[in-house]
Amino acid sequence: MGERTGVIVAGGQSTRMGDVDKTVVDVAGVPLVRRVANRLLAVVDHLVVNCRRDQQERLAAALEGLSPTFAVDEVPDRGPTAGIMTGLSTVETPYAAVVAADMPYLDPELLEYLFERADSHDAAVPRPEEWFEPLHAVYRPEPMAEACAEALEAADARIITPLSSLDHIVIERDAIVEHGSLRSFESVDTPEDLERARERLS
C-alpha cells in the first residue's frame, strides 16, 4: 500500500452554498474535507490536497494531524481539469486516487477495487450512470497530468477530455454495485445536501 497517493481536489467555488467554503463546513462534528480524507486514507498512504491559495490555511486546520501535501493552483478557478493536473503533478507514487472534496460517503472498498482495476492501465474511471466520474477515479499521475495540460492548452477544459488520450478502463454500474456503494458518488452541493449528510453521519 506504500505505492498509493490520494488527491483531494478542493479548489472549486462553492457557488450553491452561498459564501461558505463547503470543504471545511461542519458535518456532524467533522469538517467535510476531513471526512473525505479519513475515508481516502483507508486505502492510500500519502495525501495531496489541491486548492486555491486562500483556502490553504483553512484546509490545513481542518486536516491537522493528517500531514497533507498542498498543491496550490498557480492560476485559481480554472476548473477541475486544472485541479487534477496540479494535484497529480506532485504525486510520486505509481497510482493515485483523485476525488472531490465534497464526497462524504466515499467508499474505501470501491476505491480499493479501482486501484486493482487500474493496474497496467493509465486509469480506471467509474460510470455509474450515463456520465463518467473523473473526480472519483484512479490514475497513473504522469499520463493524466500531461493529458490535462494538453486539454487546457487547447482551451478544452471539459473534465472528460483528457481520458481520450489515456489507456483507461471504464467501471460500469454493475461492477460498482458488486464492489462498493453507489452512494460513494454523492456530493454535498447545496444546503439541503449538507443537512442530509449531517443527519446520515450523526
UniProtKB/Swiss-Prot annotation:
Keywords: Cytoplasm, GTP-binding, Magnesium, Metal-binding, Molybdenum cofactor biosynthesis, Nucleotide-binding, Transferase. It is found in: Cytoplasm. Its cofactor is Mg(2+). Gene3D superfamilies: Spore Coat Polysaccharide Biosynthesis Protein SpsA, Chain A. Transfers a GMP moiety from GTP to Mo-molybdopterin (Mo-MPT) cofactor (Moco or molybdenum cofactor) to form Mo-molybdopterin guanine dinucleotide (Mo-MGD) cofactor. InterPro entries: MobA-like_NTP_Trfase, Molybde_CF_guanTrfase, Nucleotide-diphossugar_trans. SUPFAM superfamilies: Nucleotide-diphospho-sugar transferases. This is Probable molybdenum cofactor guanylyltransferase. GO terms for biological process: Mo-molybdopterin cofactor biosynthetic process. Its main location: cytoplasm. GTP binds at residues 9-11, 22, 50, 77, 102. It comes from Natronomonas pharaonis (strain ATCC 35678 / DSM 2160 / CIP 103997 / JCM 8858 / NBRC 14720 / NCIMB 2260 / Gabara) (Halobacterium pharaonis). It catalyses: Mo-molybdopterin + GTP + H(+) = Mo-molybdopterin guanine dinucleotide + diphosphate. One of its GO terms (cellular component) is cytoplasm.
